[in-house]
């Protein structure tokens, strides 16, 4: 094979690997954002119910503690939202 063809194949492989890494990072961040939105909605719902009824909803608090108590999405991710 010619050197130009080999260089083109290597460039495609490298571009593919970079694309996989970038989209993996995007997917992990998307999951973090989606999880944070769930937590924010639960906190809002708990505070609204506390204002309305004078006490907090036990079911919402349990769901919130389950979401917050989850482990890391990936073991190599240290900072957690």
Curated annotation (Swiss-Prot):
Comment field (misc): HIV-1 lineages are divided in three main groups, M (for Major), O (for Outlier), and N (for New, or Non-M, Non-O). The vast majority of strains found worldwide belong to the group M. Group O seems to be endemic to and largely confined to Cameroon and neighboring countries in West Central Africa, where these viruses represent a small minority of HIV-1 strains. The group N is represented by a limited number of isolates from Cameroonian persons. The group M is further subdivided in 9 clades or subtypes (A to D, F to H, J and K).
Recorded GO CC terms: host cell membrane; membrane
Top-level taxonomic group: Viruses
In-chain residues carrying the UniProt-annotated modification Phosphoserine: 53, 57
Protein name as annotated: Protein Vpu
Family: Belongs to the HIV-1 VPU protein family.
Domain text: The N-terminus and transmembrane domains are required for self-oligomerization and proper virion budding, whereas the cytoplasmic domain is required for CD4 degradation. The cytoplasmic domain is composed of 2 amphipathic alpha helix that form a U-shape.
Gene designation per UniProt: vpu
Pfam family of the protein (one): Vpu
Subcellular location: Host membrane
GO molecular function: CD4 receptor binding; monoatomic cation channel activity
Topological domains, Cytoplasmic: 29-81
Activity modulation: Ion channel activity is inhibited by hexamethylene amiloride in vitro.
Primary location group: host cell
Protein purpose: Enhances virion budding by targeting host CD4 and Tetherin/BST2 to proteasome degradation. Degradation of CD4 prevents any unwanted premature interactions between viral Env and its host receptor CD4 in the endoplasmic reticulum. Degradation of antiretroviral protein Tetherin/BST2 is important for virion budding, as BST2 tethers new viral particles to the host cell membrane. Mechanistically, Vpu bridges either CD4 or BST2 to BTRC, a substrate recognition subunit of the Skp1/Cullin/F-box protein E3 ubiquitin ligase, induces their ubiquitination and subsequent proteasomal degradation.
The species this protein was found in: Human immunodeficiency virus type 1 group M subtype B (isolate MN)
Record PTM: Phosphorylated by host CK2. This phosphorylation is necessary for interaction with human BTRC and degradation of CD4.
Transmembrane segments: 8-28
Topological relation to the membrane, as annotated: Single-pass type I membrane protein
Assembly behavior: Homopentamer. Interacts with host CD4 and BRTC; these interactions induce proteasomal degradation of CD4. Interacts with host BST2; this interaction leads to the degradation of host BST2. Interacts with host FBXW11. Interacts with host AP1M1; this interaction plays a role in the mistrafficking and subsequent degradation of host BST2. Interacts with host RANBP2; this interaction allows Vpu to down-regulate host BLM sumoylation.
Keywords: AIDS, Apoptosis, Host membrane, Host-virus interaction, Inhibition of host innate immune response by virus, Inhibition of host tetherin by virus, Ion channel, Ion transport, Membrane, Phosphoprotein, Transmembrane, Transmembrane helix, Transport, Viral immunoevasion
């Amino acid at each position: 094979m010619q050197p130009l063809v080999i260089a083109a194949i290597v460039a495609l492989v490298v571009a593919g690997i970079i694309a996989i890494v970038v989209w993996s990072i995007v997917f992990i961040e998307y999951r973090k954002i989606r999880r944070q939105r769930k937590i924010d909605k639960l906190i809002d719902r708990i505070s609204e119910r506390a204002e309305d009824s004078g006490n907090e909803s036990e079911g919402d608090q349990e769901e919130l503690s389950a979401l917050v108590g989850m482990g890391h999405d990936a073991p190599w991710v240290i900072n957690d939202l």
